[in-house]
């Protein structure tokens, strides 16, 4: 049997910052599933650096992406980091705190749409599957308002876990206080240690939704 894993998202899903020959969290998590479940994992990645949540949602309209989603046992999603960076830059210019609440609501709405779209693609009576959505870590601990916004956003994101199949992987807690250790030289993306920590965060959520677990 092959476990099919589809990863959607932004630069975190591509593994940006991990180093030339070092994998991001996707390959690491795939390897963990292989070891735990004693089955081969086939991975499909649909992600690009710079994508915002609206663009990640748009990936789900492509026929080949839909096929991979339909077949997937495990789905992971990263997103909203680029929306966050854009809003921080806009705030530094305008000092308008409502930017964060607008971006937060927009991101959350897009995550809800992604989960609904996955359910629509899966159709009625699908095979067991799991969705893991990463919350946001804070690459800007020196900007107070960014920290408040991320905490609020992550709290709101937890409501997604009320949907069947969905659990939230906690990147925020594992990066808090370890930014220097877990972030790459650009100060935004994880390094190899950071991606290992992300893989462990999603791994510890288990696979009880899957028939192979």
From Swiss-Prot:
Catalytic residue positions: 11, 186, 189
Enzyme class at the top of the EC tree: hydrolase
Entry keywords, A to Z: Hydrolase, Sporulation
Gene Ontology molecular-function annotations: lysophospholipase activity
Residues at which substrate binds: 50, 82
Family, per entry: Belongs to the 'GDSL' lipolytic enzyme family.
Full protein name: Spore germination lipase LipC
